[in-house]
From Swiss-Prot:
One of its GO terms (biological process) is photosynthesis. The keyword Metal-binding does not apply. Disulfide bonds: none annotated. Its main location: plastid. Keywords: Chloroplast, Membrane, Photosynthesis, Photosystem II, Plastid, Reaction center, Thylakoid, Transmembrane, Transmembrane helix. Residues 1-7 form a propeptide. This is Photosystem II reaction center protein K. The lineage of its organism: Eukaryota, Viridiplantae, Chlorophyta, Ulvophyceae, OUU clade. It is a single-pass membrane protein.
Length: 44
């Protein structure tokens, strides 16, 4: 059952491959946003 599910997952999520490729970058963007926000608050 698990092997069948794992075999079907790539085909089912084929349209979402670009989204999965971008997902690891999102936390880095939030971290960069936090640094920029802190800099703007401290410089005010």
């Amino acid at each position: 059952m698990t092997t069948l599910l794992l075999a079907k997952l790539p085909e089912a999520y084929a349209p979402f491959d670009p989204i999965v490729d971008v997902l690891p970058v999102i936390p880095l963007l939030f971290l960069l946003l936090a640094f920029v926000w802190q800099a703007s608050v401290s410089f005010r």
